[in-house]
Regions:
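Residue-level detector of bioactive/disordered segments in secreted/extracellular proteins
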Residues: 24-25, 97
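Intrinsically disordered, low-complexity serine/threonine-rich segments
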Residues: 22-23, 32
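Sec-dependent N-terminal signal peptides
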Residues: 9-22
Length: 316
């Protein structure tokens, strides 16, 4: 009888121990579930090679689960994206391409958003929670590569707009001086001025640097017009997109897309860790170069043959 009473007295304590034991087992998983960040990746179109490469490189770095959305898939309409953004309630969103970014910014502008693969990001609506990797390289890096291949180029012409690229132009001018290069600029207010500005600029320079500026380029026709004007003067064109070399540009320095994805992953990791990022929008770290050797020979340009092995692709 005494043993039975003793057992009854201990029952409440045993029950409490069992309860806390269960809580102890469940607590780590609950904490883990709460602490795992919710990451959403929106790709404007995963069938585009450069977008896909950035996405794959991003996923190789990020170890946490990622919810992926391909806007190239017809099932994703604006309304379904809106529902997903609210349902998932992500801690951070990685947007590849302009379409992805604009959707995220439209529906959840107060969320942390990291972008990449967007030409001329300065034209986009941004918030204090916007981060990204620019699609435009550091001007000093580009000029270093220009001079490596064409060491005799001393004067480079640039068309720019006061609205989007005036600050970039001033910085590029200062960096060029340190390399012994003079950058001569012509400001425009809209693309209708392209031809007249080029006709004034080209006779004074050794090469033309075609930069990313929405006032300058908004259609393929704008690009072709500029390339044709430069070709008529046999002025080599340096630019920022590899496909331009196929259309007549002499030398292009573009971003390396897998590196872009890894950089974006680094930004995402930093933001989720609460790190203070000095540069919210970073310059790309990697490059991909194309030399149109056919144009070089057509124009009779002097070039550094010893540096050809540094070029990623040569058009013969």
């Amino acid at each position: 009888m005494k043993n039975s009473l003793r057992t009854i007295r201990w029952l409440p304590y045993v029950t409490l121990l069992w309860f806390f034991g269960c809580c102890g087992l469940l607590l780590p998983s609950l904490i883990s579930a709460e602490s795992t960040p919710r990451i959403l990746l929106i790709n404007s179109d995963a069938s585009v090679t450069k977008y896909k490469e950035s996405q794959e490189a991003f996923k190789q770095v990020i170890t946490q689960p990622i919810v992926e959305v391909d806007l190239g898939d017809k099932k994703w309409e604006s309304s379904t994206i809106e529902d997903l953004l609210y349902d998932e309630d992500p801690d951070i969103i990685y947007c590849i391409g302009t379409k992805a970014y604009l959707l995220a910014n439209k529906y959840v502008p107060k969320k942390n958003i990291v972008f990449s693969s967007i030409i001329n990001w300065l034209r986009l609506p941004i918030t204090d929670k916007t981060y990204g990797v620019s699609n435009e390289l550091h001007a000093g890096m580009e000029m270093t590569l220009f001079r490596l291949i064409f060491p005799n180029v001393q004067k480079i012409g640039v068309l720019y707009s006061k609205k989007y690229t005036e600050e970039w132009f001033k910085n590029a001018q200062n960096q060029a001086k340190e390399m012994g290069v003079e950058i001569i600029g012509q400001a425009i207010t809209n693309k209708k001025q392209n031809v007249s500005a080029l006709k004034k600029l080209l006779p004074t320079v050794n090469a033309f640097w075609l930069i990313s500026d929405p006032e300058l380029l908004s259609t393929k026709e704008d690009l072709l017009t500029i390339l044709q004007e430069c070709a008529a003067e046999k002025t080599p064109v340096f630019s920022y997109h590899e496909t331009f070399a196929e259309l007549g540009a002499t030398f292009t320095v573009s971003v390396d897309d897998p590196t872009i994805g890894r950089q974006a992953a680094g930004i995402v990791t930093g933001v989720l860790s609460g790190d203070k990022l000095d540069n919210k929008v970073q310059f790309p770290a990697g490059t991909y170069t194309v030399l149109n050797l056919k144009k070089v020979k057509e124009y009779g340009l002097q070039y550094n043959e010893g540096a050809l092995d540094t070029i990623n692709r040569i058009i013969q």
